[in-house]
Amino acid sequence: ATTSHGATAWEDRGLRREIGHLAAELDALWALTRRNISQAARDGVPGVGGSVFKLAYSEVRQKLGDVSDRLLERAALSMDDLDGLTNGRHVQGRLHALSISIAAGTTQIQRNIVGERVLGLPKER
């Protein structure tokens, strides 16, 4: 992908920064996953860590899709693979990312669970 000035996408400092942030968020998700597994193995129950993970994972998947859309440009809209790109898989991944934000409880429900069980906030009315 190239910018309107003819530069490559990788020359876009903002895009590189965004990719770096995504890499850090993915590392944090991996650490959270290991913590959740350890807690479940120790206590025999998954706890609310799964809700925290689901929220973070849904958000990172959306951000990753946004960056991919910028890189793929118009090809991101096609279900057919174009020019050797597997953009059909990208489109399926984008749709799957949307379904993840609904599966196992909407993002708002997961936020309520975290607020009540982790942060000790009162139940939403």
Residue ranges and their predicted role:
Residues 1-125:
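Alpha-helical interface subdomain recognition
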